[in-house]
From Swiss-Prot:
It comes from Mus musculus. The keyword Lyase does not apply. The keyword Flavoprotein does not apply. This is CST complex subunit CTC1. GO terms for molecular function: G-rich strand telomeric DNA binding; single-stranded DNA binding. GO terms for biological process: bone marrow development; chromosome organization; DNA damage response; hematopoietic stem cell proliferation; multicellular organism growth; negative regulation of telomere maintenance via telomerase; positive regulation of DNA replication; positive regulation of fibroblast proliferation.
Amino acid sequence: MAACRAQPPTSEQAWLEAAQTFIQETLCPAGKEVDKELTRSVIACVKETWLSQGENQDLTLPFSYSFVSVQSLKTHQRLPCCSHLSWSQSAYQAWTRGGRPGDGVLPREQLILLGTLVDLLGDSEQECRSGSLYVRDNTGTLDCELIDLDLSWLGHLFLFPSWSYLPSAKRNSLGEGHLELWGTPVPVFPLTVSPGPLIPIPVLYPEKASHLLRYRKKSSIKEINLAGKLVHLSALIITQNKRYFIMTLGELAQAGSQVSIIVQIPAQMVWHRVLRPGRAYVLTKLQVTKTRIHLSCIWTTIPSSTLKPLRPGYVQELELDLEFSKADLKPPPQPTSSKDSRGQEGLVRASKVLHYLGTVTAVLHESAGLYILDGQLILCLAYQKIHGLRRVIRPGVCLELRDVHLLQAVGGATTKPVLALCLHGTVRLQGFSCLKPLTLPSSKVYGASLYEQLVWKCQLGLPLYLWAAKTLEDLIYKLCPHVLRCHQFLKQPSPGKPSLGLQLLAPSWDVLIPPGSPMRHAYSEILEEPHNCPLQKYTPLQTPYSFPTMLALAEEGQHRAWATFDPKAMLPLPEASHLTSCQLNRHLAWSWVCLPSCVFQPAQVLLGVLVASSRKGCLELRDLRGSLPCIPLTESSQPLIDPNLVGCLVRVEKFQLVVEREVRSSFPSWEEMGMARFIQKKQARVYVQFYLADALILPVPRPTFGSEPSQTASSCPEGPHLGQSRLFLLSHKEALMKRNFCLLPGDSSQPAKPTLSFHVSGTWLCGTQRKEGSGWSPPESLAVESKDQKVFLIFLGSSVRWFPFLYPNQVYRLVASGPSQTPVFETEGSAGTSRRPLELADCGSCLTVQEEWTLELGSSQDIPNVLEVPRTLPESSLAQLLGDNSPDSLVSFSAEILSRILCEPPLALRRMKPGNAGAIKTGVKLTVALEMDDCEYPPHLDIYIEDPQLPPQIGLLPGARVHFSQLEKRISRSNIVYCCFRSSTSVQVLSFPPETKASAPLPHIYLAELLQGDRPPFQATTSCHIVYVLSLQILWVCAHCTSICPQGKCSRRDPSCPSQRAVSQANIRLLVEDGTAEATVICRNHLVARALGLSPSEWSSILEHARGPGRVALQFTGLGGQTESASKTHEPLTLLLRTLCTSPFVLRPVKLSFALERRPTDISPREPSRLQQFQCGELPLLTRVNPRLRLVCLSLQEPELPNPPQASAASS
């Protein structure tokens, strides 16, 4: 505070001279001579106040104190302080003990403050008075707060013995501090006491004034004086045009004896600080006026009206020359509330109205008007426009609340009861705080106008308002300050420019706000009986939704994914019990969980800034706590191709949170699947998928994250002021992967290592264009018009961020900023030319995209004489895919992913040195169903992703539709067509997996239909008859090495086989026919029991008997033929199985669901028909017979028996 005042003088004479100088400069009217009487009065007042301590009798003047002006406080005092001239040191210490331990108490400064107490900010009487109080001297005016005010104090010079000064809590705001005036100010000159009236004032009391108002037409009285006890005082109403308040005189117990007066004269707004409910007053010169809303009449003051305390002998009741009947004297009937509960009587609760006196213990949110009282109650002042008082409220302040609403269990993450004031109630300051103001974050200081709009324009009820305030605070925690500044997020809305905070909350308010909610009317809220306001009734709120951070959402997704990870549930027992250890662990190695947004309670809303990552080459939604990869799609199955959306704020309510789980396990067999110790490692990859139609995209008014500054340049609507650009049509994009690049000259010191990069090939559509204002100049003429304009672009380093936006058959604009005079896009034979000679053989130029270059979505319409670019995706024909004429060609197609499993890496990688084993990645096998317009039953195809340099691909999930471009087609040694990812491959997700997918039933066909047409169904159902059994085999094999296990012990006898487990495996081959054709069907494992007609317990018993020999095999030569058995034929189990296989229990009609053993991708030559002789009586018949179909059993059921005919009624 040293800067606020000079050092106090050391002698009495010097102190008096400094005081005289201060009084002359600060308190004397400008332009007048020295007022010695004023100087003597001020010093005498200071001396009297100083000596009132009782501890300073040895010093008659406060030499340690110095005078301070208003301007000095506003200019130099940057920290809160207090001064107590009349307090002793012990009194100050006792006062400071009122603060809680750890809280900062206001430091004491030795300052003397004098000034005139006024209710007018300026010097002109024409200025509007708002009811605020000020301390004024010659240097300026300062806002102040006073607990008790007497109207006679206004305009007089006072010494303020105890006060505190608090600068503004907002940064960079000078002169917005305020004074808190403790105790009663001491007048420098004695105040003149106004004598009572010479004759008593004729007055009406409330009961007769109320009757007169109702029957005013019967009386000629136009102006009255009113006396009575103040029973109710409304809040000070602040509108755009004026301020006013309403006071009610009368008796609380008698509703008909009350009368209301509206005070709306600006000079009388200060009355609101003086009036105290329970005291009696006299108001003079009242007239009748009509309210704007209800057009009802009410008494009102005029500029010459006065307010006086009611004292005995000052008034005399006025006798009216009116005669009232008994019916007239009855109070008017009270209207009943017409508020409709809309059928929710069981949910709607009523608040309680009460008076409360409490101490503020915490500030929840200053801008939202939320505080904590006595550590137990939430105080909400948002439903009153209280501006001046809010700056005073801090821990330690004592408040009196009258006619306040008590709401309990409001919900919306609020557990404490809430006290809320409507316009009918008042809040009055009862005591200041000795504590310094808390240093609040910007989120709780800015945005008062936004929170007012939530109440007054959006008409939010209290439960919803509390939730909205908490949600806005969470959003600031997510986005500020690196995404945008707090004051930008909470800025006051303007026409055409809604607040960003409101835009994020508003999309769901149509559901949350009840339809037909009435608008607030101040007159109705204050005057209507019974009382009706937004706080009168409320419905407890279930938290509608929340905005989790990206980190919290990813952690929640992983938690749910691993909580549902159950190996036994993933592999049901009938299937798992027959798998070897290798098969078992491979099935568990990869799985995924899709969590739609509807499964979260409360609902989760995705909110983040769209960022293109240069480290991963994918799109991310990012906030201050983390980021999540994302895949946005349009409704037309098109990806996001506009780079201008980078840096925008994305809000999504409907999305899919995908968690891919990878597990490294070593379960010996299915029996140990419940033991967690066999899981060595597990990891998850989390990302989100959503459609742009379900997203709200908002531009952010400033750059987003400083870690990747270059990517926000394209999102700037103005664009660079200087630069050049060129349009190109993209024809193909290669895979994003780590590639080797030659070192540039001078970089030999850096070791070469693979770099994440990708390449695109395309065609220049025109020459270079220069920046002209906000657009581009016409394209420059080409040096050689006939030259091929094909181009090869290399993206590496920071330019990898453009990978998610580049897709074939799209037009893009490559922009290079800066005043470069050299056309950078015409450069040929760049450093990348020698790196990829094969790819560049057909390209006229090669460019490495620089990190500072940006990408924009272009259009071929920008260039004249250029045909519209087709948007269809390249598709290979079915003949190209499944033909054997081009075994190593590149193919493109769209398909639906049916399954995805992890597979072993290629043999070349498995032969790597043990030291590099950590770098080996397992491959991925996708089984897809091709989408072909001319194919009724889409064939299935396997796709392998085995390149270790390829980063993990997101979005390749079962059920998703994907377009694969330039896969390498291969043919296996068994003539099966499959495809592999290569560096030239690119992937485009067309649609996400459906949240609920109903499996379509298999078609029911005749077997002969499988022999007709080129593309029969791969899977189907048929009704057939088992003719005979061809073979049956039951094995017990080692779960680790698959060797035969007689007596349950591995026959390999190799120390390298650690397994002590054996699993059973069985298969049976059947001959079936349905009258149109015959087929051999193989059934495996648990389906063997169904084929043999055995119950689970009977099948388990047979398996246990087969455990001893380890292998039981039966081979049947034909119908009626002998059995060829690898087992001993005299053994009981063999005899049982041989008898069973030839019995009618097996040879029966069944309903068979099957898959073709010959896959649609099998291009091996089909087996030709053969000649076969049949005996028909005595005549031999020779005919050509088609080869038997080979089927794999999927399920086997007993045929449905026809319903028996209804028995006819017996004749009488």
